[in-house]
């Protein structure tokens, strides 16, 4: 039998030629982390969370905990480096089970954060 699971993270897409990772992390008062680079546009994952909660909002709050209150800084960095932000939500929903599936709708505080930071919501779900 399949198990429910979910992954959430904040994704930053950037161009390596114009992006200063050290400035980005220092501006947000986050520890600089080594990250993998792929393709022309590169990406950073922040707040990766795989600890399942039936309410996806709780998982997202863990993902965004170090970014809440820094919306203006994120927006300024977005403009400075021409960044793209995504909130990635990747749940696995189990078909034909008596257990409830994950609540996927976002609550107002998270929607407000996405709006203020011009972050796109990316929901990729798998049905098992």
Region spans (language model):
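Acidic (Asp/Glu-rich) sequence patches and key acidic residues
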Residues: 1-126
